[in-house]
Amino acid sequence: MSKKSQLVFAMVAGELSGDILGAGLMAALQKTHPNARFVGIGGPRMEALGFESLFAMEELAVMGIVEVLSRLPRLLHVRSSLIKSITELKPDCFIGIDAPDFNIGLELKLKAQGIKTVHYVSPSVWAWRPKRIFKIAKATNMVLSLLPFEKAFYDKHQVPCTFVGHTLADDIPLESDKASARQLLELDPEAEYLAILPGSRGGELKQLAEPFVKAALLIKQQFPDIRFVTPLVNQKRREQFEQALKAHAPDLEIHMVEGKSREVMAAADGILLASGTATLEAMLIKRPMVVAYRVSPLTYQIAKTMMQVNRFSLPNLLAGRDVVPELIQHDCTPEKIAEAVGVELNRDFTPIKAEFERLHQMLRCDASQKAAEAVLALVDAKDVN
């Protein structure tokens, strides 16, 4: 364990899921180094633990190849400023949390300056653009992976990697309490609820709010007594969703909640959601789900040429088979979504729940503590390449 009186960590988290991981890692590091300093880009959970943000996390929350290109000048400015600030700070370690297209380039520059670098959350090199592994090898001293099958890929390419599990699997109980979640959210304890999660980023809502709202109308026709509840990450996303609701289903009642996505999923009988980390959370909460996603046509055409897998959601990737329905791009239509939700709400969930429980146990590793131990070991290590 490092004996230095004050350790300094530079960190960059690009979105909500990274903020959750970053806060968990900070809390674990603070157990042994209570006066450690944390600087870079973080979200509200990290800032609540004393993180010093140089830029708002929202700066990095962009999706899709085409969308990133439109923001490229600003992203390059942010990265350039961070390189300067972090190089001057000379931290004991830099930890890039997810956001690989931003962080790997940043790590490459910082490592060249003699700063130890960690990438927390393996990019999906096993799924698309596998040659990124060579850049990752140059940019990082260590990768912290969340999924067990990722480490074998890094071992094959002789890139230092530690499987730490997922902090969500540690935080979420093996059996979620629907009644308590409904009480907290002041929802009817007897009604049937579908949670609708169209994503946490503006670009996601731009693509998904309309088909999700239209699908809700069709679902209401199948299940006249069903109710809808939607968590929105902030006021901007709420306004975006309200606009879609007003435009496409002005008479449909959807109960909106700011934040509390985990509680909303726990309170629900089924979940319709965007592909992403939320699918892992839904799996850990153990609810029937339908995963849907689409991006701009050009982004999709470019991405399709680089894909190495035919599954997108984390439950299916972890299981190695189709456990939950995925409706991607051209299949992401109100009609197909409504049909899939109907099937999931009516089918026997027992075998799927058993698989979710198996996967939950597999990912329960005290991730934040394991990640902190790996980072501190790197800080103490001599002769690191």
UniProtKB/Swiss-Prot annotation:
Looking up Pfam families in the UniProt record yields: LpxB
Q: What do the Gene Ontology cellular component annotations say?
A: membrane
- Catalytic function, reaction form: a lipid X + a UDP-2-N,3-O-bis[(3R)-3-hydroxyacyl]-alpha-D-glucosamine = a lipid A disaccharide + UDP + H(+)
Cite the annotated pathway. Bacterial outer membrane biogenesis; LPS lipid A biosynthesis
Taxonomically, the superkingdom here is Bacteria
Does tRNA-binding appear among the keywords?
no
Q: Which GO terms describe its biological process?
A: lipid A biosynthetic process
This entry's Enzyme Commission designation comes to 2.4.1.182
Q: Per UniProt, what is one GO molecular function of this protein?
A: phospholipid binding
InterPro entries given in the database record: Glyco_trans_19 (IPR003835)
Keywords from the named record = Glycosyltransferase, Lipid A biosynthesis, Lipid biosynthesis, Lipid metabolism, Transferase
User: NCBIfam families recorded for this chain?
Assistant: lpxB
Q: Relate the protein's function as given in its record.
A: Condensation of UDP-2,3-diacylglucosamine and 2,3-diacylglucosamine-1-phosphate to form lipid A disaccharide, a precursor of lipid A, a phosphorylated glycolipid that anchors the lipopolysaccharide to the outer membrane of the cell.
The text of the family note is: Belongs to the LpxB family.
Q: Name it.
A: Lipid-A-disaccharide synthase
